[in-house]
Amino acid sequence: MSDPLPAWSDAFELGRLPPVPQLVLDGPINREWAIGGSTGAGIKVAIIDSGIDASHPAVGSVEGAIIIEPDDSEPDGFRVIEGPHTDLYGHGTACAGIIRSVAPDVSIYSVRVLGERLTGKAWVFATGLEWAIENGMNVVNLSLSTSNEAHIPMFHELTDAAAFAHVMLVSAMANEPKTTVPSEFSSVFSTASIRSDDPYEVRYNAAGPAEWAARGVDVDVAWADGSSITATGNSFAAPHVAGVIALLLAKHPGLTTFQVKTILAAMATAPGSVTQ
């Protein structure tokens, strides 16, 4: 009898490996090849934030919505409320409007974890992220984060789960120079803002910790109560990247997290043109 293989070896036996899409190239990886002609149809995008105003003309339809809020009377310390809801601040609506403008045919889902002051509890945020992973979202926009080091293990476990489930997590870096999670984990699309008039422009920084940058300075965004404002911040760059990733996944389904990163990096160095 042969000695047993070391742990994890069985998963790599022929016939057991899950299929990974092979990219067939007929030219350079550029913006036209990656997202040209795509509208994001068939892609589910969750926005974990302050809620979404589905009646805002810049947002369009919201396919699903849940609220996760603390509740000491519940065994787990929180309750989940399914169904339409309002945006308590305007921040989530802004992100939804940006994503809709970049990828008009995506299915948007709202996961409300922040309150009317745009604050919340890390474990409520984590519960919302877990919901997005378990409910088959393709892309998750995270224009929020935590700087509390005590929460690093919890979010590290969730971001790993997302990566292996091929769920793309796009997370805004903090607007101040401080360490935050999950934005700085390597499997996450950590995003900073640049001044640009091109909503499809994505820049790549291999040195990190902010790996990606997109339009996020003086951006006209949807806001609460049907209004709009001009805003600046990494929060508004992340949904631009999330929208571009949705376009990419719709055109090239089944890509892994690191395949998407490779393609985005190639787009950033050879942007080309795009046909929408």
What are the roles of these predicted feature ranges?
Residues P84-T93, A174, I229-V241:
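Gly/Ser-rich catalytic serine loop of serine hydrolases
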Residues S2-V102, V106:
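Active-site core segment of subtilase-fold serine proteases
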Residues W33-G40, G120-N141, H151-V167, P177-S190, ...:
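Mature extracellular/periplasmic domains of secretome proteins
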Residues N138-L142, H252-Q276:
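C-terminal subdomain of the subtilisin-like protease fold in secreted/lumenal serine endopeptidases
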Residues F78-S147, A266-A268:
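Subtilisin-like peptidase catalytic core
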Residues D53, I68, S73, L114, ...:
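Active-site/binding-pocket entry motifs
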